[in-house]
Amino acid sequence: MKAVIPAAGLGTRLLPATKAQPKEMLPVYSKPTIHYVVEEAINSGIDDILIITGRNKRSIEDYFDKSYELEFMLQKAGKDRYLKQVRKITDLADICYVRQKNLKGLGDAILSAERHVDGEPFTVFLGDSITRSEVPCAKELIDVFNKYKKSTISIREVPKDKTCSYGIVDSTNIDGNLYKINDLVEKPKASQAPSNLAITGRYVLTADTFDKINQTEPGFNGEVQLTDALSKLDELYGVKFTGNVFNIENRIEWLKSSIDFAMDDDEFRDDLIGYMKSFL
């Protein structure tokens, strides 16, 4: 199964930090955001990855590409630890790129992947969203997809007053964390939201999704919304995710994500805790 990572958005909510660099390249503790997304795909058993980029996104390609000058400098300086880290990035996966020429929404971005997907089921990872859990979020979806052979999305609970920031689902619980999706609404007001279950930013989709996108008129913000296209599918399942989700375009979640990863580092944990306590 192939992975598609949309990463063409401008990141306007993070300006001025994103004026000269993609939001997907903003650092989360020690690595760029999109590095964690690619790692999740790999840990879910996927090594064929298509990243959908746009203007001013060249640094994403440069990051995953081989850097001969940097490797030569590190080798000459005897910095073997850093040389190993740099080479590991290049060898992560087979990554291809395609440009979304016009930013017409997530649905339109996914259409850019149709030729690469070549009629097979595929996964979608939003390039500005990081998930953390014992079992990768996408792996949970793939397992459900392999059982039902129907498009499957990740969902999670969000505060009722935050539904206007997410795609929200109307669903029926089948068993445990498994839901049958009845309808999807893009960023509804709290009073109009069918639930507080939001789409997490991870999907396993069948190839007929492309037909549904082509049949979808521009919706919220005048963009072709993936949620509108998914609502046209005959059958759609949701898996409730219970791990951590960090939407990097939300400033507080971006800050929390770095703290979350830093707390796993024995070298800095105690100093970080002491620093945060100084504000209490």
Regions of interest found by a model, annotated:
Residues 20-35:
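Short catalytic helix/loop segments, enriched in acidic residues and glycine
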